[in-house]
Amino acid sequence: AFALQEQAAQAGLPLRCTILESDPSWGGKIVTHRIGDIVTEAGPDSFLSQKQAGLDLCTKLGLADQLINTNETGKKACVLHRGRLHDLPEGLLSFVPKQLGPFLQSGLLSWVGLVRMGLEFAVPPGSPRDDESLAEFLRRRFGVQAYERLLEPLMAGIYAGDAEQMSLRATFPRFFELEQQHGSIMRGMMAAKKSASSSASSQPRRTMFVSLKNGLSELVSALTTRLMQQGVELRAGVQVDALRVRSHELGRWMYDLILQDGSALSAESVVLATPAYVSADLLRPLTPIAGGLLDLIPYASTATIAMAFPRSLTSAIDGFGFIIPRQEQRHLIAATWTSLKWPHRAPSDQLLVRCYVGGVGREDILQREDQALVATVREELANICGIKAEPVYTEVNRWWKAMPQYTIGHLDRLVQLDAALSRYPGLVLTGAAYRGVGIPDCIRDGAVAAGQVVRDLLGKVHPGRE
């Protein structure tokens, strides 16, 4: 809606915009809780600074001075291997470890595994026509050991997914591009790093992930305030039960939204930013093909458990947290030492921890009651890193069918979806189900959707969305 107001003004297009939200509050999965001096995030706790859309929106909303980097000290992260935590090599996310010595001596990979990972430079590129799974791609390029012990929890964990089912080109298109352009991920990453250092920006230095000083809900508050100032009508707690289409006297479609209370809202353009399974139900009567394609986008359920412990009893804990490979067969997916990673998150005498459970193939634990879920997580924390203290604060946040899964064939299905909707100008889909699950991805996709709406309302023929 923000991008739509911006682009409509630039095009000289007058419009009246209404936003309907079924939840009683705004922000979707962005939910910040403030309890005294403790700040927790029920959903995402940060966003990638390398994707400019998030930073740009914060700047436009006057939040640039509220952006915070991760702490400078104690940056290390760990991975669990055979029941023990091992330091992850710095630079692993770019596949170019900054210090080879500690990595070689860590015991994470055998010498055979290390040599195989290093041979990535010599592995020929795969076919540009194949939609390879993320697991197949990473094993092919880096070997089985590196995949199972390092890369699977790092990459698949972002989507709470199963790398065997995830589409490489839909989830990590950059890896596909680097392989095709440079013949090697490592070679491509080094070239990208060299290019970035030669074109250093005058903008403030940002860590890979950034957040907002008082939590990400600041972004939601600033956005809703700005929209109301622009005259946008915001209606929370309003559920749409049906979407109908009728012919307009000027020869274009008109859309009728049938609300839960029986009333209706008519519009020349409708943007559905709902989960794919909700959009499927709304679109199926208009186009069964689109409804069926949307049904093919599965969702994973997850939960986050936040706990605050006395720092005096957890003084040995350092770094930013740890990840757990699927092969370790734990309930925990990962844990973040929130108060060590971010400033302004907890009093100095407390350690704030955020734990993650659930995801594809590991959702059974979510059926447990809160108390049992917390007990399970505490038991694993005690076993893995020795935290046996009683938490002084605990909260559980469950997210049912919250994380869309980009399975093999996802991009082809999006092309078919666009074709199925092409006969309904002004009807647009956007959100995390399609072209990226991160906050900057959704901001960018929302801006693309806004551009499509403006073109439709101006009566221009628009090209297919990228």
Where are these regions (language model features)?
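Active-site/ligand-binding neighborhood in enzyme catalytic cores
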Residues: 76, 96, 100, 113-242, ...
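Conserved flavin/dinucleotide-binding core of flavoenzymes
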Residues: 89-90, 96, 316-319, 333-466
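Short, well-ordered alpha-helices that flank and scaffold nucleotide-derived cofactor binding pockets
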Residues: 2-10, 32, 225, 284, ...
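Hydrophobic anchor at the start of a short beta-strand
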Residues: 15-17, 270, 391-394
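Mid-domain catalytic core of redox enzymes
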Residues: 236-353, 360-367, 371, 379-384, ...
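Glycine-rich FAD pyrophosphate-binding loop
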Residues: 5-35
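Dinucleotide-binding Rossmann-like beta1-alpha1 core, especially the glycine-rich loop
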Residues: 36-125
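Short glycine/proline- and charge-enriched loop/turn segments
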Residues: 33-41, 288, 411
